Amino acid sequence: MRNPWIAAWLVSVGSLAACGPETHAVPAKRPNTELIVGEYERHPPDGETAIRFRGDGSVRLAKTRALLDTEPPLASGAWKLDGARLTVTYDKGICTERAGDKAGVYTVVISKVGIHFTKVEDSCERRSAIDGQTWWRIK
C-alpha cells in the first residue's frame, strides 16, 4: 500500500520540479540610433568636453557641458550611425580647416551610461583624441 502513495508523491514532486522558476525574456536593447541621442561629457583627466547628438542628425561640441548652448561651439555638424559605425562630420569649428579633416569614423559602444569611441579613420588630430575614451551620459 505504501508503494502507490510513494509513486503518486514522486510524480507530484517531479511535476513541480519540471515547472521550475518562470523565465523572463530580457528586453531587447534599443537601436544605437536611438541610444546615441543625448548629451555626453568627458571626465578629468581626459578633459571636460561635452557633445550633443540630436535625433535630427546634428551634433554640437563644446568645451564644457555648461557651454553646449553658447556660441560659437567648438564644432558643429552632423552624425550618421550604421550599426556601431559612427561618422561625425563637422562643418563649423575645429576639424574644418582642411577638407580631409571634416569627417571622422569611429566604432562605438553605446549604453544608458555613456558612449565609448574606437577610431576607425580620422585625420583630425583634435577629434582623434576621443579614441579609446568613454564619454559619460549627461541626459
Residue ranges of predicted features:
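Short linear interaction motif-like sites in intrinsically disordered regions of transcription factors
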Residues: 6, 10, 80, 136-137
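Lipid interaction determinants
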Residues: 19-78, 85-139
